[in-house]
């Protein structure tokens, strides 16, 4: 439908009480264009198509319980019962065009086409009951060669603002008018539950992707992160088909020479915090693609954890939480509207989504050169891994496939020790192909572009959680500064027992006694037994990849004494 026809329909509607809108086309009072959604949409709802941020604020405050404006101008929202992702409820449709590519199993659970269509119809039926719905058109991927067009159709202003921030926004009204048909569409009816008796459902929540239909359907969860990670899953599938490597990583580069660094790590290990460096330009905090020409960000915004946030520790993130930012599930003072980032009474997974423009040192377009350094982040609550280690090529592949971090003991009675978590490629819930495919692509890129690789532990030292202490953020930043300056590469190393890491003997700004972990433990025997316990967990977890692993790759892991 061209612009002239759209304007003609708008003019007719404004001058007559009759509805001359072709079936499936909807007119919004806020925009001058029409938008074709789907033949299944009834046409009764008012459509807000890429509305201004202020409009979404007004809608959330007026119609969504729990919404408020904080003292810094951010919008507080509530995601309902679900305050985090539901990985056990994610499904991928098993269909001929993609079924041979996918790593089926507990990560990628198969769904049949009929179940997907039942959920799709259920979602659209729910959206059709709404007086208003929101449509956000945007892009995933800053490199025009690889970007995809994404359309989000949802019933909450909170979800619309979230995706307005996280997608790459059309530059102007003309670009939006020429957006055309999306490559992928997300139907978010998260307020409405899935039918638990539909074949393949594990609960009333469902997050389903169909690569043939190029659609994603969300039911039974209002947690906005499902949309963001759904797009990452789509890119994790599409990019290797185009010969480029998608990564769950953050990225920044030096202001003066374009020296680029990629940070890998699971949630809570420091990707967002450590990539937001005032002395470097931010490319992105979570999702990137490494191509033959360099790296590009998939997203138009950042999604930062807010627990214990302070301006002193993380000034760039703290100051980004202003008008236009979305704060999820935080607690605030009803009188002053100041947020208490230490209060986790709703959830520990408090989050904020804000556009890249909120970071003063963000680079536009969010594209960088080939990385000079690869940094793998882990939060080792066992207190065994060094604050920094230098990795060889096989160790990079091994630890990338393993994707280790550890969770601290919770509040449950009897739980006193850390729990090891392994997430392949530092993003197992989002990968689609077998992990070795991504690892082989990474090894190829590292070799081709001579990138150095490091493993950094942001977790505990001097003992496990409960005995030792958390490695200070200032020390981690000093390590990263020494990597960027090239100083750390020149410092002699000592090989660590069992794990075989090359550990620098010193680092500017870091106490030398914490660099080799055993030196910080008062109980040396306890250290050795804990190290052997952790090594066994590594060895056991790697067994599921051994059928596709070379002997050199297996040998890159921990080796216990006979």
From Swiss-Prot:
Cross-referenced Gene3D superfamilies, in alphabetical order? 3.90.228.20, Phosphoenolpyruvate Carboxykinase, domain 1 (3.40.449.10), Phosphoenolpyruvate Carboxykinase, domain 2 (2.170.8.10)
EC assignment: 4.1.1.49
| Entry binding sites for ATP | 265-272
Q: Which CDD domains match?
A: PEPCK_ATP
GO molecular function list: ATP binding; phosphoenolpyruvate carboxykinase (ATP) activity
The biological processes this protein is annotated with in GO are: gluconeogenesis
Q: In which pathway does it act?
A: Carbohydrate biosynthesis; gluconeogenesis
**Which top-rank group of organisms is this from?**
Eukaryota
Q: Matching InterPro entries, A to Z?
A: PEP_carboxykinase_ATP, PEP_carboxykinase_C, PEP_carboxykinase_N
Q: Which SUPFAM superfamilies match?
A: PEP carboxykinase N-terminal domain, PEP carboxykinase-like
GO cellular-component term (any): phagocytic vesicle
| Recorded catalytic activity of this chain's protein | oxaloacetate + ATP = phosphoenolpyruvate + ADP + CO2
Q: Which UniProt keywords apply?
A: ATP-binding, Decarboxylase, Gluconeogenesis, Lyase, Nucleotide-binding
What the record says about family reads:
Belongs to the phosphoenolpyruvate carboxykinase (ATP) family.
Q: What is this protein called?
A: Phosphoenolpyruvate carboxykinase (ATP)
Species source reads Dictyostelium discoideum (Social amoeba)
